């Protein structure tokens, strides 16, 4: 059996178990298991199938063992903001409602009207941008719809916290994900007790906040028996974007980062939060990062639009087009000029992404895309112009001029998007590594194991180990 570390990286559409090893200062990755993920409608809401996720995590651990690996450590990362509640017997309460559900509509306005909490005040306390699905709005929606669930709750765990708890039996809230609740103080980096009390939420359900690198414990005897080995459960940056930022092989302090996946998150790492009125107006966020740094970034709709178009075309024809086929179609319509605002809530969960893009173009008196290539080119135009605006705003807010954009994650494989991004922003684009999130997850484990002394050494190893493609503006 080969000793290794294991990253369980779960996204909105799929999850992977990726084994990592270090030899002669170089990192090797091997995917040992993959599974599908998604939402379904239950009790009137879009929900995650948490029971299936739990089983798939265990299935992947078995697969690693069956492939001849003996993980010494395991780390789990997922998306942010979503959570589960446990009762006094540690049983789950209610459903794990997904962030794309509509239950939070109107909640932000209700907080101001009923609790006197303006968004400007909220932002000044937490530094977290407005998104309709922020955990605080989900909790307040739950309080309105099912107050009995909050009353019965004894433990609040975000999705990766809960999966970690199932593996080792230790409840904890990890900092990078906890920060996305908009209930953590930007300066204190801890639960904002006054804010929680003001909103009438039960303070006792929130667990002590732990940082990435914390060892929670060993696999429970039941899990050990099921998977065939024991391992330490370590907290990575459990928010997938937090892990992805760790994997950015930035060369200097003038590099901006873009984690490109279902969501595009563009920003930089800061030592202190920026929570002034200009930052609030720009809706930039100060999410928790590794070693209590801040990921100062803009949340952009990202590849969700492309994924939705692809899925929709597959439903219409019976065969999903490949991403290269969609890129080729866009190139054929490269002169199509229209673009929309990817951050408009109309694109969050439309019945038809293609028709929503067309309607948005019509609403703004632009040419309406007809063929698939025109729709795709419109999406590419929209994303890259959003990236350009985000870079310009970032420079204004930080007072820095950035010279490069480092793209990690699945979107870094899209050479057409990378080149269009370089053209739109005027920045040199460095693309890769592709497995940014899983790699960042593993970095924390490698530092814990002593394979690397610190993050700087780990990032240098990433540059040695993976192909990084360069795109110059044209």
State where each predicted segment sits.
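Active-site phosphate-binding/coordination module
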Residues: 61-134
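N-terminal glycine/serine-rich phosphate-binding loop of ATP-dependent small-molecule kinases
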Residues: 1-94, 152, 224-233, 425-427, ...
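Short, basic and Ser/Thr-rich N-terminal targeting/leader segments
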Residues: 11-13, 72, 77-79, 135, ...
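Active-site core segments that coordinate phosphate-bearing ligands/cofactors
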Residues: 6-7, 19, 112-126, 137-158, ...
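Nucleotide/phosphate-binding loop and acidic/charged catalytic motifs
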Residues: 101, 173-178
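Glycine-rich beta-strand-to-loop/alpha-helix junction loops that act as flexible
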Residues: 77-80, 212-213, 260-263, 404-412
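Short, acidic/turn-prone active-site loops that include or flank metal/cofactor-
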Residues: 34, 97-104, 262-264, 433-437
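Short glycine-rich phosphate-binding loop at a beta-alpha junction
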Residues: 70-78, 155, 208, 400-409
